[in-house]
């Protein structure tokens, strides 16, 4: 029997068991196509399934866990959503028209086929619809919207985005893809070394998720605190590779337990020049972002050696970085320079940007090298110059109103990737190979077949 079938059976069994259970064992291995993922409760206790995170606090049956599932790396995967549709005929609480359907207008969810069509983006790409209006003082206007599902309103834009994982949140420098739940930029974001602002941001996110996604009244302060406390206990990472074995074996430091002791503060190892002052220690940038598998560099195991080679590629493969809004257009930075994956993924052994630095690398551009034909196209016009631009997601610009922020989103944490395909904020990369192909095309970087296989093995081991 194929591994994928076995994994699906295990996941189905887990869904049944957890529906009747009050907790998950700490460090329970959960299968994915590359091996097994584990979540570690930093309190070294079972992971409770009875708190506010798992309770339906709204009116549509949803809880936080509807879109942040342990088996999917605490987000949702396309395959996981498809399984839930199959098991419930599309009646699981994740399938709700307020934001789970492609549009909330002119849809028919009275039949299984109707629901399959209405929720096609959620099923195929794991996407939730995010509806936002322009800030009153926006530097641009919406000239037109071409949405294949309806929702063509120019005053309320519908974007389609992947839910971010509700684990490893202690490492965040920005909350949400567009930073809309983060402290306003007029104040220092999540100050070093105090995480109080992060906790406040997560509390606000929990409130907005309950009133929005769950269509409920604002949760009580006690419920919000319970959700945030729960989220902050979770550390998730790939723990076992089906070829290389345990990822903390042979002096390697993979897996979630080691991750729990990883040092982090906002600005740690920031890749911007020291003159920007983003790293409060003033330390120079270290391009060796990951050292999890240094001990495997000379391993006699071909699988372990491959993972170690992939780590080296991530840390050192030269990439010409140009045309990236948020980097190349920043005063004091060159229009083009040679960097690495770590230029944008600089947080040690975590892999996101350690400061709040939304970027536009081209994922939302209409000429993206990946298939984005399923996304709407927004034509935006600069109010001052008359310049127009087309994008599939205005990103951060819908929060700040700034023309320069169009298309910018944050880079996500890279741990637990194997359990949460598809990738990028719009789900346009179905596989990690698609991610690599995007970078090959967008940044004109060449990977040999061996380098691609090595890099994928490494990313799957995070």
For each predicted feature, which ranges?
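Periplasmic c-type cytochrome electron-transfer domains
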Residues: 21-462
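Bacterial N-terminal signal peptides
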Residues: 4-14
């Amino acid at each position: 029997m194929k591994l994928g079938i076995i994994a699906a059976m295990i996941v189905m069994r887990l869904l049944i068991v957890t529906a009747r259970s009050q907790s998950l064992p700490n460090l329970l291995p959960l299968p994915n196509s590359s091996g097994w993922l584990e979540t570690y409760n930093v309190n070294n206790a079972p992971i409770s399934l009875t708190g506010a995170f798992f309770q339906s606090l709204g009116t549509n049956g949803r809880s936080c866990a509807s879109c942040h599932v342990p088996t999917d790396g605490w987000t949702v995967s396309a395959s996981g959503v498809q399984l839930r549709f199959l098991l419930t005929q599309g009646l699981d609480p994740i399938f709700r028209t307020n934001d789970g359907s492609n549009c909330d207008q002119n849809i028919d969810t009275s039949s299984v086929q109707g629901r399959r069509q209405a929720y096609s983006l959620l099923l195929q790409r794991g996407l939730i619809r995010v509806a936002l209006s322009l800030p009153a003082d926006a530097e641009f206007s919406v000239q037109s919207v071409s949405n294949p599902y309806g929702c063509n309103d120019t005053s309320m834009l519908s974007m389609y985005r992947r839910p971010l994982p509700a684990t490893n949140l202690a490492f965040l420098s920005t909350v949400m893809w567009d930073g809309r739940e983060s402290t306003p930029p007029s104040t220092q974001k999540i100050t070093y070394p105090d995480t109080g602002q992060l906790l406040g941001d997560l509390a606000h996110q929990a409130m907005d998720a309950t009133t929005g996604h769950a269509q409920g009244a604002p949760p009580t302060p006690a419920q919000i605190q319970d959700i945030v406390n729960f989220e902050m206990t979770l550390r998730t990472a790939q723990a076992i590779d089906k070829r290389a074995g345990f990822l903390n074996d042979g002096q390697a430091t993979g897996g979630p337990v080691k991750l729990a002791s990883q040092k982090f503060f906002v600005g740690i190892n920031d890749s911007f020049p020291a003159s920007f002052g983003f790293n409060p220690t003033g330390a120079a940038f270290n391009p060796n972002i990951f050292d999890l598998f240094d001990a495997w560099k000379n391993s006699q195991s071909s699988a372990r050696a491959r993972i170690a080679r992939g780590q080296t590629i991530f840390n050192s493969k030269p990439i010409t970085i140009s045309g990236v809004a948020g980097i190349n257009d920043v005063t004091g930075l060159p229009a083009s320079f040679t960097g690495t994956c770590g230029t944008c993924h600089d947080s040690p052994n975590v892999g996101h940007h350690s400061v709040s630095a939304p970027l536009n690398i081209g994922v939302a551009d209409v000429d993206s090298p990946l298939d984005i034909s399923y996304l709407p196209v927004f034509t935006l016009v600069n109010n001052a110059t008359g310049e127009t631009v087309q994008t599939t997601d205005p990103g951060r610009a819908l929060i700040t109103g700034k023309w320069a922020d169009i298309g910018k989103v944050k880079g996500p944490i890279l741990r637990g990737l194997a359990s949460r395909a598809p990738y990028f904020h719009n789900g346009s990369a179905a596989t990690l190979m698609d991610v690599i192909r995007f970078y090959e095309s967008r940044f004109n970087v060449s990977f040999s077949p061996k380098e691609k296989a090595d890099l994928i093995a490494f990313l799957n081991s995070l």
